[in-house]
Amino acid sequence: MMTIDNRVADVFSRRMAIQSVAALLLGSTVGVAQAQLPMSTAFNRAARNRILSQRLAKTYCQLLLGVLPEFSAKTLADVRQQVRTGFDELAKTSMPPDLASRVADLKKLADAADALLVFPPTREAVSAVAQQAEKVMAASQSTAEAFEKIAKVGSAKLINLAGRQRAVSQRIALDYFLIAAKLDGKGLQEQMKADMAEVRKGLETLAAAPVSTPAIRNELELGRAQWLFFEAAMQRAPDGKGMETVATTSERLAEVLDKLTDLYDGALKEVLG
């Protein structure tokens, strides 16, 4: 059995190793560091484009279908602003060349998606936005994985995992609305089933993870409960009431999982000191 002294030594050793990585990533100049995001938060900001891309396409499709027009328009405007703010914050972060290049490429894809949103939500426009959103999500996923490899700490993996669940849940909702708009292409139903299974497994993995706090456990329970509401909503026919229910439950799920991901970000910052 590990003694208290051994545990303290182990924690201290781990903290020193993580801080060494943090120092390498964040830079040694105090003035620069103060102007930059913590690397864990930069990781979260870049990875957040997974969920933001799907929410953009989802709410744009909701506008096409006439689902809660005022709510959908406000959500779309808010998400577009979050994308811009996120990249503005990332521009303040010093990072290795490979990561900087990935973030720059990701921004180009996100800008292209945003440019499409100036057009009215026709079927053709919604289809184009959905396709571009998938490109943004793929690029954001690879960027998140690159951040995780550099960080080499368990909390980074959890930020990535929690962040992916929030994104995949929104892709499920987007697919529901694409089907309602009769824009469901080949393989969409299979993707929805796979995504549903991925979120269930992801939430189970997070629940079993050793990195936890009371706040994380509470938010995770809220997330799992909200997921059940969302699953039930997804069983409804895509009529007026059904689409409204999916729109509201998916946004509530996004809110909870976004907060959960931010809590993992906070836990990593505490470890980094």
Task: Indicate residue ranges for each PLM-predicted region.
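Mature extracytoplasmic or organellar-lumen-exposed domains after removal of signal/transit peptides
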Residues: 36-273
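Intrinsically disordered, low-complexity sequence elements enriched in Ser/Thr/Gly/Pro
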Residues: 5, 12-13, 48, 164
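Sec/Tat signal peptide C-region and signal peptidase I cleavage site
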Residues: 31-35
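N-terminal secretory signal peptides
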Residues: 1-12, 20-30
